From Swiss-Prot:
Highest taxon of the lineage: Bacteria
UniProt entry tagged with the keyword Protein biosynthesis: yes
Cofactor-binding details, from the entry: Binds 1 zinc ion per subunit.
Protein name listed in UniProt: Cysteine--tRNA ligase
Native organism: Hydrogenobaculum sp. (strain Y04AAS1)
EC number assigned by the record: 6.1.1.16
Amino acid sequence: MGFVLYNTLSAELEEFVPINPPQVNIYTCGVTVYDDSHVGHGRSLIVFDVFRRYLEKLGYRVKFVRNFTDIDDKIINKANEENKDFMSIANRYIARYYLDMEAINVKPANVEPRVTEHMEEIISLISKLIELGKAYESDGDIYFSIDSFKDYGKLSKRSPEELEAGARIEPSLKKRNPLDFALWKASKSHEPGWESPWSYGRPGWHTECVAMIFKHLGETIDIHAGGIDLVFPHHENEIAQAESITGKPFARYWMHNGLVTVGGKKMSKSLGNFVTLKEIYTKYHPDVLRLLVLFTHYRSPLDFSFEKMEETKKAYERLKSAIEDIEPLKAIAKEGKPVVDIDFYSLEKSTQEQFYKALSEDFNTSLAIAHIFNAVAELNKAKTESFKIGYITPKELEGYLFLANSLKQTLKDIFGLLEENTLQNTLKTLEPASSVNISTEFLEILIKARNLAKENKDFKVADFIRDELLNYGIKLEDTKAGTIWKKP
């Protein structure tokens, strides 16, 4: 089944045609791990998790790469505030990230590369740009010259002059053009850094993603995804570097989700108007957040409020009641006149057709979920009438179950809803564990996070969790049957 997708690069709806079908390579920019993830991050994670599930349902073989930025000024500042090594800060928040993703049912990426493990590739990429005359050294720093790339601004649809006028750019005498951006920044001797041909330093943000994409996905990928706030300068600068080296399109499709706002202002840590994912999934079932995200078209802004969470919670309860709370209905099944005039089989067919049609038109989850809720309304109508009269006929019950099971399977497979897991159940009742008495439930969650890290070959995080637990006198042992723990 084909579908069309809005391509930020062309600003048009385009038919999706992978480079090497059925393979689809996707890269999405991950988090900078200096603090807990908030709802703004969660929206992007959920949108592209569902998009990936949709592609897989259509039969595509998806390689999904999402990175960790584990070296950044914000991480270094946090480390200085706490008098810790920057890597311990990064590892802490990567571990928490894994907990968040498991809680909100976001599937791990196939590859989750860390910037600090790709210094060789980053330095090699910068060297190539210098050789090509696209980058220059200035007092130990390396800058990309935007004047060397004639298509600069093609993603954001603005000229360099317009970009300069609208951008918040730090003035620097080191730059030839105010829009030139850092590929490598010299570090002070006491700061984190790596040796390079130019200086002891660390990479610029825009270079990191290009190097990781080249290594894990190749020179041209099918889809590059991320938040709309990354179009400029981040994604614009990625294109300039990648296409300067290869002379080929960096990505065939650019897919961007809209911002999460609070009262019309972007949710961000700098404004202090953010709500962490943990705050959400300890107060609500995580499916409520997924549903809130799916109710809005991925390209539109999503204005967050707890009032909307409450409304979504009620909608979710209607959904669960219709699809899962079926035993009381089975108990009153008996022969008699039909209770309702509903053709459950025709409704199932039309709902599925409308559902997939909506998703095929620029991944319109808002319309797709509306079709699901239309069918849910019919199920709840049948339940209400049956309980009022006191029975449902076996034939109607059979049709009801057929429709309910079909909807449930679709919601699980594509939207990642109604997939209860032990972590979600635990989080509903979990009390914060004290530093001297870690609860069994919380310990099991940490083991889950460690196992996820190991599955993704992120052994630094796995070792970090193990070592932190050792500080509390808890020893983890990996056995053939799984991970066991021992307390003194």
